[in-house]
Amino acid sequence: MPNTKSAEKALRVADANRQENRRAKSQVKTSLTKVKKLVDAGSINEAETAAVSAQSNLDKAAEKGIIHPKNAARRKSRLMKKLNQAAK
């Protein structure tokens, strides 16, 4: 339990930030999974449009500091590698 008003506010702020970070991470994971499923199903055109959204989600998460920028770059690279291999 917080003992001061500032500690109460810090608790509220931390909770709000945690919820936002969890939402953003979940959105990233969902968009990546969607692309992978579309690639596995052979829907390359739909996968390409979903990949644009996934890259955007990764960039936004990296920009906000939710994930490390190099983590976002690595995930985008692997995603596009998988998409390009499926397109061949």
From Swiss-Prot:
Q: Which SUPFAM superfamilies match?
A: Ribosomal protein S20 (SSF46992)
**Single biological process term from Gene Ontology:** translation
| Entries under Gene3D superfamilies matching the protein | Ribosomal protein S20 (1.20.58.110)
Bias regions of kind Basic and acidic residues — which residues? 1-23
Region annotation (Disordered) ranges: 1-29
InterPro entries xref list: Ribosomal_bS20, Ribosomal_bS20_sf
What keywords appear on the UniProt entry? Ribonucleoprotein, Ribosomal protein, RNA-binding, rRNA-binding
Q: Name one GO molecular function term.
A: structural constituent of ribosome
Q: Which GO terms describe its cellular component?
A: cytosol; small ribosomal subunit
Say yes or no: keyword rRNA-binding present.
Answer: yes
Q: Which family does it belong to?
A: Belongs to the bacterial ribosomal protein bS20 family.
Report the function annotation for this chain. Binds directly to 16S ribosomal RNA.
Q: What NCBIfam families does this protein map onto?
A: S20
This protein is called Small ribosomal subunit protein bS20
The gene name on file is rpsT
